């Protein structure tokens, strides 16, 4: 039996750790791999700079935890059978990195995510509500998030500023960015079919090489200076009810 006060010991167990609560544990710069947690709760734990590989966190919740500059590789945060995801509430994800992970149906709520990176991962149905910029004194430092080569179909991004973020080579079909600020965001090479940009601002956004059948420009708040590829012109004209002849 693992004492609930010993998270480091729990990571060393060969059998799954089920239904335990870990609070106020400090695993700064901790390195671990191949552990499995199910229905566990992590409160006020520190994982800053940790490197976590090939671990599973099934139906887990992280509340008020810090993951600054932590790295996750090939980790799973969703139940493969029920598709129930894990929850992240009021966590510090600043400069954290997730590579080749499964974050499908996860809920990221009221977190900080300045320069968060998610690459080569699945995050279908992700619910994302996080501050992606950093305020220093009275000055706002723009950072955004970086999501590249990710499956994000049906993801919902809460109305917020994602300015200067990069959503590149991602599957963004059926995603929602309603009422969000996407100024200077890069959507290069992503699939945008049925994406919801209602009320969103896409000023100087880059949609080059992105794929879409139609784009509801009228529903956007603004798209001044938006960049598209030449091969997208026909679809954009069709979206406005304009047909090309000759």
Locate the predicted segments by residue.
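Tandem repeat scaffolds
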Residues: 1-246
